[in-house]
Amino acid sequence: MPSCSPQQASKAEENGSNSFMHSMVPQLEWQMETTQSLVDSYVAIVNKTVWDLMVGLTPKTIMHLMINNNKEFIFSELLANLYLHGDKNMLMEESAEQAQRS
């Protein structure tokens, strides 16, 4: 069995660990790329969700409130006032323009 000096043994260990690390580099790079891709996707989802909540949802909410308020006004006050102050027969008559179309 050949004997080797401690320096040679340490060099052999370094070479062995270097070859081990060299074989691990592609796997580590793949893991880093995968992790980076997952983080990018997560950040994009969070940004879209925040945008939808802050910017995208506000106009929708305003339109919803406006439409609901108008609908409530029409059903509660407008129709009641029309029936109260107007001639019901006149309200139900077909306009001349509509009669010509028929």
Swiss-Prot record:
Residues 32-102 form the GED domain. Signal peptide: none annotated. It comes from the Eukaryota. Pfam families: GED (PF02212). GO terms for molecular function: GTP binding; GTPase activity. PANTHER family: DYNAMIN, DYNAMIN-1. This is Putative GED domain-containing protein DNM1P34. The gene is DNM1P34.
